[in-house]
Amino acid sequence: MSETHDKPTSAGEAPGHPRFLAHHYGSFQQQFEAGKLGMWIFLVTEILLFSGLFCAYAVYRANHPEIFHVGAKFLNAYLGGTNTCVLLLSSLTMAWGVRCAQIDRRRGLIVCLAITLLCGGVFMGIKYVEYRHKWHDGLLWAGWFKPSEDAAETLRGSDHPAPARDEPSADTAPAPESQPPPQEKSRRLGIFFSIYFTMTGLHALHVLAGMGAITWVLVRAVRRHFHSQYFGPVDYVGLYWHLVDLIWIFLFPLLYLID
């Protein structure tokens, strides 16, 4: 996506510099390319930030895979899947919005941005429901991990899975593997939920930042600031929003679909 022509200067604008064209740029094309380069550099720093979290996730899961299988039982895959669909829809409408800005479809741009903003609100609403449920059950980060009676019952049940029909008898079965003491298991689960809240919480903050940026672009679209030669802010916000969606596409299976 690029801007290939300069908008002619109208009588009410400064000579040689149309509205929204910064004075240190010679054309909308140059301004767009410079802005997009800066946006990509910013997105690389965001990727590096989340890469550190994904590395921490990989190390801890490699060392304690059983804790992730137990912890995943307390996550609602249906809510996570719904949020995934919502963000995928928002990426589609954001891409349509960028296209509408490129071809001077102001009404389409406004509608697409509004739908994208609505999808972001739905995502945060579902995430609030999830967090509220975890808070009620005491399934919080390390140091605050104090499971409620129902959660503790589920945790105890995970220690004694139902035997399969073809299992050997008690006389011939090998000795069971040693299980960590309850306090140690709770501590490990607390670390699991620390990872969960850190990764999903940081992602939620990025969603809120994206919603703020979309609101800013939406207000400017209503004020007729964008046209086929000047749509850079819409494109930049769209890139950011797509990255936020992509990060969630990785978070969802890694946290919710472990089993």
Per-range role (PLM):
Residues 1-259:
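...captures the hydrophobic TM-helix bundle architecture rather than a specific catalytic motif
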